[in-house]
Amino acid sequence: MNSSSTPSTLSTEATSVLSREWIHKGTKAYKHAGFALFLVGFASFSLIYCVQPLLPAFSQSFQISPASSSLALSLTTAFLAISIVLSSAFSQALGRRGVIFTSMLCAALLNIVSMLTPNWHSLLIARALEGLLLGGVPAVTMAWIAEEIAPEHLGKTMGLYIAGTAFGGMMGRVGMGILVEYFSWRTALGLLGAICFICSIAFLKLLPASRNFVQKKGLNLGFHIQMWRAHLSNTKLLRLFAIGFLLTSVFVTLFNYATFRLSGAPYSLSQTQISLIFLSYSFGMVSSSLAGSLADRFGKKTMMMSGFALMILGSLMTLLSSLFGIIIGIAFITTGFFITHSLTSSSVGAESKQAKAHASSLY
């Protein structure tokens, strides 16, 4: 099977690109969709990473080791990684918009429930379930964008969603770090859960109904295996999956390493000071939202190479002994990551002709 082929069993289900009712930039539907996508990116990623600045508080409250407290985050991401693949199957049968909304709403409610957990194990169960639910957001959202937004606006729209994830990741870390200075960790979790609950309602009101979605009745396992196999046989998609894996690995490792390095001598920064480094996500918000427009002007390949170059330059700068140089390096890496991530994720949607949620889940 070559990179452009698709299973014959799906040929009757494909919607002609020429006959699709695309959402175009400048319309009311596009404006509503852009705001809704920003909200879903913010809510999902703030719920994932909100516990990171709370780990010391967990250690003290439940009398556990720092290593054990990190399970509050690692369990969430582990269960998200599992459910994100399965979510593509459910959304193909149930519809994109409903799956995203239900996942967001229930995850927000679980975050509120987390503030009432009586012991450590019940908190971990809540966080694991939250990750399981949030798996229904990223891949399905990217599939909705690829199916509903006009191809010429795909990069710009994906950038709005990625900007929301950047803002959510930043506020989940920095915002919660500030809140816990004035309130208990329980109150902080409840407040964020309430905010994300409101975001989920606004998302449902704003996101236009699907126009081009082709429903697949039932949860036919053979169909989904066939789709994943088809995407994994597509060499172009494989390259995009590899880029996504490498980008995320570098980005996550950077912040983990920087936290330990800057907390030790000769910098000896406090946890609050270190958490402020995550404000560099604001560069990601800007770069991801502009990436699509810049790619239209200068070419996608040029912008992706520019993003890679920024990440390499930033990585070299983090080797400096100067604190200022390290912070600038982190800002460069963040900017480059979100440029490349935004363009790569939009390319996955464009390259996958059918079963877009399956391709997005693999990415």
Predicted regions and their residues:
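Juxtamembrane intracellular "pre-TM" segments in multi-pass secondary transporters
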Residues: 17-27, 208-241
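Helix-loop-helix hairpin linking two adjacent transmembrane segments in secondary transporters
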Residues: 122, 151, 160-207
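Helix-breaking motifs and short loop linkers at transmembrane-helix boundaries and internal kinks
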Residues: 63, 95, 116-122, 150, ...
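Helix-to-loop junctions at the C-terminal end of transmembrane segments
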Residues: 84-95, 287-299
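Paired small-residue
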Residues: 106, 110, 121-130, 324-332
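C-terminal transmembrane helical hairpin of 12-TM major facilitator-type secondary transporters
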Residues: 301-344
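Cytoplasmic helix-loop-helix junction between adjacent transmembrane helices
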Residues: 126-167
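Conserved MFS/SLC helix-loop-helix module at the cytosolic interface between two early adjacent transmembrane helices
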Residues: 82-121
